[in-house]
């Protein structure tokens, strides 16, 4: 039943069924069921529940979940150093040749890395470092391929600093993915290649890769709603930056409707914060834009400062600048700047550049408002 719910996109419900089943299962199977529950909670946007279960799963394996992004950063730097010193060479082994507890540990770190990747990027990257080292040590080709592919996605968040490494990882990932010929690995490759292009400002290339990813996942895989959610989200955001607003407005309502039908909090929040304001601005309805974003972020975790909070901030400021409320826009940014820095969101180069230009626009809008008021007073 849990698998059936996950396959229909009901991640939260599926996760709860996994937890119920774990209570009546033997130790090893119970741990695997709890891992799957943690993964589905995180992928479905039930972040607080997911982290709670994840702590239990990781604790049973002797792995501590970093309590904050800052704590995770120190561990991440160590993992990255270990990966560089070790290299990416691996000895291929079949799944049957690898101990079950070793595979479970790899999969648990994969669940954490994937589930936090586009929520709490630094904490996700820390688990990805662990995941990468474990996958390479085991040598199972599919797990190595997805580890290197996901590593390319995380590497792309460093922007121009990590461009060469990202390109190298994507090249290696493509060779592995083509060799093993597993649809999920193929879809994941185009998803990460698309996100890497998006973060590099190559939006047409990003859109093409992300559309390819959506097609592969939709036609060949089950239980991949998170993957499709992100392929669609970043594809639509690419259209936004390309200025293809008509295409964006045509496609967005149906995707939002589908997310609500399966109560996919991850998709509802991402679409609601990162994109829903734009059609409202086009229709000159800033009040509806504010309402849409508030309803979207209201459903999200209130612990920490996640990428979803960043998207909400981005949208709110865009709406206030459009409305001529530069002073309000600047106040919103300034109020959220400290939590954003604390959450290490600005360690992602694309986010830093975007937020700096937005703060400058808000400051200019404030200046314009002040000048207009001075002219009126005069």
Residue spans for each PLM region:
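Extended alpha-helical scaffolding segments used for macromolecular assembly and cargo binding
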Residues: 1-44, 49-56, 98-140, 147
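Hydrophobic, small-residue-rich alpha-helical packing segments that form membrane-like cores
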Residues: 158-261
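A conserved hydrophobic secondary-structure block that centers on an alpha-helix together
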Residues: 116-163, 181-190, 197-203
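Amphipathic helix-loop-helix modules that constitute alpha-helical solenoid scaffolds
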Residues: 42-126, 157-168, 225-229, 240-250, ...
